[in-house]
Amino acid sequence: MTDDVPDVRRFWESLGLPGLVDVHTHFLPPSIQRAVYAVFDAAGPKIGREWPIRYRQSVDERVELLRAMGVRRFPTLPYAHKPGVATYLNDWAAGFKRDVPESLWSATFYPEPEAASYIEGLVADGVEVFKVHVQVGEFHLDDPLLDPVWGLLEDAGTPIVIHAGGAPVGNDFTGPAPMARVLARFPRLAAVIAHMGAPDLVEFLELAETHERVCLDTTMVFTDFWPQPYPVELLPRLVDLQHKVLLGTDFPTIPYPYAHQLESLARLDLGDDWLRAVCWHNGVRVFGLPGA
């Protein structure tokens, strides 16, 4: 996959940037990574379509590929799919951070009685980003067990990448309403809405417009693979939200070259300043530079 490198570097070099900040990448323990690949390979009910994953190299090879492409900061974004696994995932992610210092120290949680305790410790230790995935984990964002967690994260200002939308296949736990209820109680939560909230693009856009710390990530939206064209009438609002849109890709679990996500953003024709903000400046503002 080293042939992907020139196209990616050409993109950010043409914008005069020093690289990219990608806020939505995944690195998981090998056994769980294999299980995730198997779910996508089976194109089961939570995937809903063929999804040929392009990047299946080892952890070390994928890290080196991101580095070669010029991705300066990237997370692991583990996500707990059931009670009792968050601590295992978080311990593995902490080890990854030690081995890959430019990565964003990531962690996850699940609605369980001990969640507030381990989140409090992780925040104190300096975790840089959390991830939850309600479509996979099948839980409600406004579960009372998460109330103390949201309070801790709102006070800390730590970003949380939240897969709250119904893409690729919705269920009883997805959609904008639970996120809106959480934000009504914790309005300064630093939520990064994965996939721009697709398919509920308008509703999640409105949450970003009306809440100071809510941002959107671009993951897979705008690409040719994505089944839902982004409404043209919403593009001016994305320009207004230039400071709140963050580059995300879902690497390695994508069925096209990494550069295609970047090309899909460029062809929106929202201007080079918008691209610079999305692909670098916003991520640096939220997460800082490596070693800073």
Predicted regions span which residues?
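Short, acidic/polar
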Residues: 56-66, 88, 111-122, 145
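Active-site mouth loops of central-metabolism enzymes
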Residues: 45-56, 78, 104-113, 138-141
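A cross-domain feature marking catalytic cores of carbohydrate-active enzymes
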Residues: 25, 78, 107-111, 132-134, ...
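Mid-to-C-terminal alpha-helical segments outside catalytic/metal-binding sites
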Residues: 1-23, 30-73, 241-244, 255-292
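Conserved, mostly hydrophobic/aromatic
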Residues: 24, 66, 93, 122, ...
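Short, well-structured secondary-structure segments
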Residues: 63-66, 70-85, 92-110, 131
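Catalytic pocket-lining loop regions of alpha/beta-barrel enzymes
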Residues: 3-4, 128-129, 139-246
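Active-site environment of divalent metal-dependent phosphoester hydrolases
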Residues: 26-31, 81-84, 112-115, 137, ...
